[in-house]
């Protein structure tokens, strides 16, 4: 049995909190009949308990989670033509762990500037938002460079429908 299907592809929607990863991935998955996984669902219990107590996760905490996402991507890619995973993937070495061993994985970076994302977060109903949380996300973000040729960029300074359409266009073009 083959372990990979080269006609199938995984797209990891990445970006800072508030960039629209979950909303975009959910709608794109619906329109393309693609598999969809919110990466947060695979956090180990220890990470969930740590976050619930207000402690930020460190790189050591994230490593088993990123490995679980890599395994999930591998499994999804075997049976689904297009699969979408939501994961902030803010640091290059996080992206390296996610792509390890899977040449059929690309990233879609939902890119927006601080002001655009801050205004969206403030507009969310029933969402507790602290500006410092977004500042920290941008400080942590290592924007993909030219050496990361598997990263596709979608500008999010447009309505959700436009971001969804741009994301679908990027997927249909391939890498």
Curated annotation (Swiss-Prot):
Keywords, ordered alphabetically: ATP-binding, Kinase, Nucleotide-binding, Transferase
Catalytic function, reaction form: D-gluconate + ATP = 6-phospho-D-gluconate + ADP + H(+)
Coiled coil: none
Pathway: Carbohydrate acid metabolism; D-gluconate degradation
Domain of life: Bacteria
EC number, UniProt record: 2.7.1.12
Molecular function GO terms recorded: ATP binding; gluconokinase activity; protein homodimerization activity
Matching PANTHER family: GLUCONOKINASE-RELATED, THERMORESISTANT GLUCONOKINASE
Protein name, as recorded: Thermoresistant gluconokinase
Naturally occurring in which organism (per UniProt): Escherichia coli (strain K12)
């Amino acid at each position: 049995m083959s372990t990979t299907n080269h006609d199938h592809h995984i797209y990891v929607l990445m970006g800072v909190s508030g960039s629209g990863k979950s909303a975009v991935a959910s709608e794109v998955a619906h329109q393309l009949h693609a598999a969809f996984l919110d990466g947060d669902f695979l956090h180990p219990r220890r990470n969930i308990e740590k976050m619930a107590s207000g402690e930020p996760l460190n790189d050591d905490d994230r490593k088993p989670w990123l490995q679980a996402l890599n395994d999930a991507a591998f499994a999804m890619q075997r049976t689904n033509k297009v699969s979408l995973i939501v994961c902030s993937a803010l640091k290059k070495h996080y992206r390296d762990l996610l792509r390890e061993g899977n040449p059929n994985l690309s990233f879609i970076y939902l890119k927006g500037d601080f002001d655009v994302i801050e205004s969206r977060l403030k507009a969310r109903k029933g969402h507790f938002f602290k500006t410092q949380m977004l500042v920290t996300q941008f400080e942590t973000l290592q924007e993909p460079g030219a050496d990361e040729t598997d990263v596709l960029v979608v500008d999010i300074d447009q309505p959700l429908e436009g971001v969804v359409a741009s994301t679908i266009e990027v997927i249909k073009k391939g890498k």
